[in-house]
């Protein structure tokens, strides 16, 4: 598992008219901007369009599209790297954690995974609204399968 890093795509987002430090909800993006964002997401995860979209019907809802929308709205838009004293640090985007891979977590050893998540997310990220970063920030009620819920 690789440690999350500040996004390398802030300039790419800026070229689409977006500020990586202040992303709007994904459903508010204009179609042209959304297509550009999807290309950045694909590059961040090392995937092709049909890895998330249904071939022949790109508008159809799929599990991965739903998860990507939640990741945008709940992670990229609401979190940043700690600037040593609170919100407003370096921006977070898909490439920050995924770094060219769809799956970034090794779930074989729960203790190792828990420590890595604590070190990588709780200790290094902040919520832009100033609330403290806790396990429950993502794992509501300590549900360890929130992505499965998002994909429904």
Predicted region positions:
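Secondary-structure junction/capping motif
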Residues: 62, 93, 134, 148-149
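Short, low-complexity, Pro/Ser/Thr/Gly-rich segments in the mature regions of secreted, periplasmic
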Residues: 137, 141-152
């Amino acid at each position: 598992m690789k440690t999350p890093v500040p996004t390398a795509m802030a300039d790419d987002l800026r070229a689409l008219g977006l500020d990586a430090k202040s992303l709007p909800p994904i459903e508010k993006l204009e179609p042209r901007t959304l297509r550009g964002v999807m290309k950045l997401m694909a590059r961040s995860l090392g995937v092709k369009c049909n890895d998330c979209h249904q071939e022949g019907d790109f508008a159809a809802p799929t599990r991965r599209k739903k998860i990507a929308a939640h990741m945008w709205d709940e992670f990229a838009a609401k979190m940043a790297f700690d600037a040593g004293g609170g919100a407003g640090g370096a921006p977070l985007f898909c490439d920050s954690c995924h770094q060219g891979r769809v799956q970034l977590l090794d779930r074989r050893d729960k203790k190792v995974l828990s420590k890595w998540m604590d070190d990588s997310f709780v200790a290094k990220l902040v919520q832009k609204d100033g609330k403290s970063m806790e396990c429950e920030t993502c794992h509501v009620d300590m549900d360890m399968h929130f992505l499965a819920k998002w994909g429904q």
